[in-house]
Curated annotation (Swiss-Prot):
Sites where the protein binds S-adenosyl-L-methionine: 36, 60, 81, 123
Reactions this protein catalyses: a 3-demethylubiquinol + S-adenosyl-L-methionine = a ubiquinol + S-adenosyl-L-homocysteine + H(+); a 3-(all-trans-polyprenyl)benzene-1,2-diol + S-adenosyl-L-methionine = a 2-methoxy-6-(all-trans-polyprenyl)phenol + S-adenosyl-L-homocysteine + H(+)
Pathway: Cofactor biosynthesis; ubiquinone biosynthesis
InterPro entries the UniProt entry points to: SAM-dependent_MTases_sf (IPR029063), UbiG_MeTrfase (IPR010233)
Protein name: Ubiquinone biosynthesis O-methyltransferase
PANTHER family given in the database record: METHYLTRANSFERASE (PTHR43464), UBIQUINONE BIOSYNTHESIS O-METHYLTRANSFERASE, MITOCHONDRIAL (PTHR43464:SF19)
Source superkingdom: Bacteria
Described purpose of this protein according to its UniProt entry: O-methyltransferase that catalyzes the 2 O-methylation steps in the ubiquinone biosynthetic pathway.
Source taxonomy: Bacteria, Pseudomonadati, Pseudomonadota, Alphaproteobacteria, Rickettsiales
Length: 240
C-alpha cells in the first residue's frame, strides 16, 4: 500500500526548485534547521559511543536541508524522497558544493533490499503521507536493533490549527497557503498507538516553539501543542 498522496506531491513539485532559497517558500525550514540539526546530533551522540561509521536514513529528504548538513558533520547519509524534482534539487546543490550524499528517488516502502540503519530521520513528512500507520511501521522496520529514530510532525490541537495554519499560512506567510491539512496532524497518543505491540520505545517528546519576544525557535520540554519531535529507540527483540 503506497504512502504517496498525489495531491501532496503536486503541491510540493511546484516549489521544489526553491529548497535552498532562504527567502522562498521553505524559508521557515532554514530558520529551524539549526535547532533540528542540533537536536538530531545530540540524540545520536548520547546514544552511540562511537559515531564514526554510523549509517543514517533521511526519509522524505526534500531538497536535502538535513541530509546535507549531517553529511558535512561527517555522517554517512542515504536520503530518499518520492519526488524526482526534490532529488534533482538536492543533487544539484550537493554537486555544486562537493557534498557526497546518497540521494535516491524512493518511498519508504519502495526502498530496495531490507537494509537497516543506525539512525532513521523523518522530519515534517508524516503529516503529508497516506496510510500513516503503515508508513510508520515501514519506517521503524528500517531501524537496526538498538538503533534510534527521530521524527517530527505537528500536533492536532486547536493551538496548532491557529498557529500552524491560520498564522503561519494566512497571516505571517511563513509557508504557502494550503501546505497543511489539519485532519492529517498527529497527536502523540496516535503515534503511541501505532507502535503498540512492537519493539519500539518512545523515549522522548520534545516541543519546538516559536519565542515571539526573541524572534527565535527553541526546544521545549513542556509545550508540544504544535510542532514536536518524537525520539524512538528499537529494542533487540520484538515484532518489528
Amino acid at each position: 500500500m503506497s504512502s504517496v498522496n498525489k495531491n501532496e506531491l503536486e503541491k510540493f513539485e511546484k516549489i521544489s526548485h526553491s529548497w535552498w532559497n532562504k527567502d522562498g517558500e521553505f524559508g521557515i525550514l532554514h530558520r529551524i534547521n539549526p535547532i533540528r540539526l542540533n537536536y538530531i546530533i545530540e540524540k545520536i551522540k548520547s546514544h552511540y559511543n562511537d559515531i564514526s561509521d554510523l549509517e543514517i536514513l533521511d526519509v522524505g529528504c526534500g531538497g536535502g536541508l538535513i541530509a546535507t548538513n549531517l553529511t558535512m558533520q561527517g555522517f554517512n547519509v542515504t536520503a530518499i524522497d518520492a519526488l524526482q524534482s526534490n532529488i534533482d534539487t538536492a543533487l544539484a546543490y550537493a554537486t555544486e558544493n562537493n557534498i557526497k550524499v546518497n540521494y535516491l528517488k524512493s518511498t519508504i516502502e519502495e526502498l530496495e533490499n531490507d537494509k537497516q540503519y543506525d539512525v532513521v530521520i523523518c522530519l515534517e513528512v508524516i503529516e503529508h503521507v497516506e496510510n500513516v500507520q503503515e508508513f510508520m511501521l515501514n519506517l521503524v522496520k528500517r531501524i537496526k536493533p538498538k538503533g534510534i529514530a527521530i521524527i517530527s510532525t505537528i500536533n492536532r490541537t486547536k493551538k496548532a490549527y491557529l498557529l500552524g495554519i491560520i498564522a503561519a499560512e494566512y497571516i505571517l506567510g511563513w509557508v504557502p497557503k494550503n501546505t497543511h491539512d489539519y485532519s492529517k496532524f498527529l497527536k502523540p497518543s496516535e503515534i503511541y498507538e501505532m507502535l503498540e505491540n512492537t519493539n519500539i520505545e518512545i523515549e522522548e517528546l520534545k516541543g519546538l516553539v516559536y519565542n515571539m519576544a526573541e524572534d527565535k525557535w527553541v526546544l521545549s520540554d513542556d509545550d508540544i501543542d504544535v510542532n514536536y519531535f518524537v525520539y524512538l529507540k528499537k529494542n533487540v527483540l520484538g515484532v518489528i
